[in-house]
Structures are given as C-alpha cells and as structure tokens.
C-alpha cells in the first residue's frame, strides 16, 4: 500500500489491522516505533535479498516471539549458518528510471563451524510521480559460529541509508480535480505533484522530504537444551539518525499566503497561487516574497529531527 508515492513508504495489514497493531520483528528483535507503533519500511530496504524465512502469527496467543500483538506478528529471519556457499551480482532496471546494483557473498559453513554472509546494494529512481526521485543504499553482514550441537552464535549488522521525496497526502485533490489538472496543463495522465518545484537556482523542493539511516546490530545465542526445550537470547543496538522536511505557512485568517497555498486544490478549485505554467510550485517566487515580507517569512520549510538509540536484551 503506497503512501504518497514515496520510496519505501508502504504498509502491511494483517486481518484488517495496520502497522501499529502488527508486531514486526527481524531475527526476533522488535522493529515498531516505541512511541506510536509505526513501521518505516524505507529503513529496511533490501531486506528481502537476505530473508531466509518469514514467520507469521495471527492475533494474540501462546507464542515464542517477544512481542505478540492483537493484529498479529511477523518475524523475518535473515541468512546465517544455513546460507549456501556462493555469490552473485546483479544489475536491475525498471520503470520510472529505477535501477538497482547488488552483490552478495556467502561462505557457507566451514569445517570449524564458521560462516559469513555479506550483501551490498544501491538503488535509485525517479518515482512514479513528479518530483519523487530517491536514492538508497543497503548493507548486511552476518558472522555465525556453530560451537557444538547445542550452541551457536550469530552476529548481524544491517542498515539502509536513504533519501527520498514524497507526494503530500494532504494535497486535497479529488478525482474531479485530477481531470482538471490534465485539462489545465494539457498533459494526459499527468503525474502531478502539487508541492514539487525548483527555486531560481534549480534546486528541487517538495513539501515532503525524508532522509534517514537506522542501522541495527545484534548478537544472538541459540541453546538447544534438549529435544523439547531451547533458549534464544539476543542483545541488540539500533541507532536512528535522520530528518524530514514539511511545508508550513500562516493561518488563512492572517495572511494572503496560507497553509492552503501548498495544497493542489481549495474547495474544489485548482490552486493557482505561486504556480508556474506547468503547475509546479514556484519556490523562487516564495523565496522572493519571504525576503520582502515586512514581518518575516510567510511560507517556510520545517526540519524535524529524529535521533534515537535503542538497545535491549531479549
């Protein structure tokens, strides 16, 4: 389910429940945001390339996982000792300027019980609408040791630094408005983005822009106690660093330029305030207006930082 047409902005629904009510884990470590329960899949780009198995559980109940949830539970298990020896490299191209370069190498388990897997990839593209270009990297490293038949250790580190533009979900364009957009600008199937544009220097802007990197490091110990019992212990560390931009403006009652200026339509009519001939947002005019304003800027980009460090023992 794409949100705003942005890279990696997707959702998972299980039994009708959204991300906030579905516990998602990677190797048994919870991934949902601790404050609101959301899950940001752009932080885990490339995870499918190293996924060994996926475990799912519907609703609450007896479970081996650390965080059961009313909607259900998803546990993604990545490659480890089971990975076969070998390697691969690939280059993929797709629609909307998408390209992806990837390599992966696995040693397989040695006679002394060691194994490693390494993956690296880069993806870029223009997005499926105007001004939604993105760029991302992802990496994965796993080093595993089979100590004996009862014990094994696994060290895993992965992350996906990325930056991408989004199309605002609050553009206020109805189905009728989309038809008006095509007629107004004379472009059939116009993949319009109401807040996309450039300034006088050609720098790209959009109301929604995201930059983030949230690597995770974990150490897992598996102990097979007997044929009926086993104990899994994981220590993990996750460091999130990034930010997002959003457009802000004065209240409509106090300014000729308001937050509605950023929308694609107002009360059913296309918004023509600060628009270029092709419908893109005129950020050059906005900057000039702000500079000349007697009481400061009327429209501004806010930068919201999200810095956090998670760690735990399961």
Residue ranges and their predicted role:
Residues 63, 72-109, 119-130:
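Short strand-turn segments of transmembrane beta-barrel domains in outer membranes
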Residues 1-30, 46, 52:
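Extracytoplasmic beta-strand/coil segments of soluble accessory domains associated
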Residues 144, 152-222, 245-305:
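Acidic/polar loop-and-plug regions of large Gram-negative outer-membrane beta-barrel proteins
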Residues 12-13, 30-58, 77:
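Short acidic/polar hinge/loop motifs at secondary-structure boundaries
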Residues 89-93, 118-122, 155-161, 235-239:
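Transmembrane beta-barrel strands of outer-membrane/channel proteins
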Residues 19, 110-112, 146-150, 226-228:
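Outer-membrane beta-barrel channels and translocator barrels
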Residues 103-107, 141-145, 217-223, 233, ...:
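Residues on the lipid-exposed face of transmembrane beta-strands in outer-membrane beta-barrel proteins
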Residues 4-6, 66, 94-97, 131-135, ...:
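Short sequence motifs at beta-strands and strand-loop junctions characteristic
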């Amino acid at each position: 389910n794409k949100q705003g047409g942005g890279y990696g902005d997707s959702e998972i629904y299980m039994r009708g429940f959204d991300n906030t009510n579905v516990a998602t884990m990677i190797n048994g470590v919870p991934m949902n945001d601790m404050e609101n329960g959301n899950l940001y899949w752009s932080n885990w780009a490339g995870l499918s390339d190293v996924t060994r198995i996926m475990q799912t559980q519907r609703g609450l109940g007896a479970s081996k996982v650390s965080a059961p949830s009313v909607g259900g539970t998803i546990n993604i298990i990545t490659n480890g000792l089971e990975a076969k020896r070998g390697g691969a490299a690939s280059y993929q191209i797709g629609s909307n300027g998408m390209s992806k370069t990837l390599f992966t190498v696995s040693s397989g388990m040695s006679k002394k019980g060691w194994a490693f897997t390494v993956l690296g990839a880069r993806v870029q593209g223009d997005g499926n609408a105007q001004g939604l270009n993105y760029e991302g990297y992802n990496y994965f490293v796993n080093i595993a040791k089979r100590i004996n038949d009862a014990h094994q250790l696994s060290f895993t580190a992965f992350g996906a630094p990325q930056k991408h533009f989004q199309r605002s979900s609050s553009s206020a364009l109805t189905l009728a408005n989309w038809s008006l957009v095509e007629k107004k600008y004379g472009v059939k199937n116009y993949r319009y983005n109401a807040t996309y544009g450039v300034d006088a220097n050609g720098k790209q802007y959009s109301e929604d822009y995201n930059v983030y990197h949230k690597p995770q490091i974990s150490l897992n110990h598996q102990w097979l106690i007997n044929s009926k019992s086993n104990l899994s212990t994981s220590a993990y560390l996750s460091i999130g660093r990034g930010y997002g931009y959003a457009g802000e403006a004065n209240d409509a009652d106090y300014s000729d330029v308001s937050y509605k200026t950023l929308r694609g339509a107002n009360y059913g009519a296309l918004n023509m305030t600060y628009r270029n001939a092709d419908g893109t947002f005129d950020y050059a005019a906005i900057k000039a207006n702000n500079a000349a304003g007697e009481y400061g800027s009327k429209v501004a980009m806010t930068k919201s930082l999200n810095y956090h460090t998670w760690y735990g023992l399961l």
